[in-house]
Amino acid sequence: GLFDVVKGVLKGAGKNVAGSLLEQLKCKLSGGC
């Protein structure tokens, strides 16, 4: 239903945010920013 679609979108957005934060962290740790 509609709830499942919304949940899926939110999960995807959360993954994207977490992924970009991890990338920034890796970049800072390796000093390659």
UniProtKB/Swiss-Prot annotation:
Coiled coil: none annotated. Disulfide bonds join C27-C33. It comes from the Eukaryota. It is found in: Secreted. GO terms for biological process: defense response to bacterium. GO terms for cellular component: extracellular region. Expressed by the skin glands. Its main location: secreted. Keywords: Amphibian defense peptide, Antibiotic, Antimicrobial, Disulfide bond, Secreted. InterPro entries: Antimicrobial_frog_2. Antimicrobial peptide. Active against the Gram-positive bacterium S.aureus (MIC=30 uM) and the Gram-negative bacterium E.coli (MIC=30 uM). Belongs to the frog skin active peptide (FSAP) family. Brevinin subfamily. This is Brevinin-2DYb. It comes from Rana dybowskii. The lineage of its organism: Eukaryota, Metazoa, Chordata, Craniata, Vertebrata.
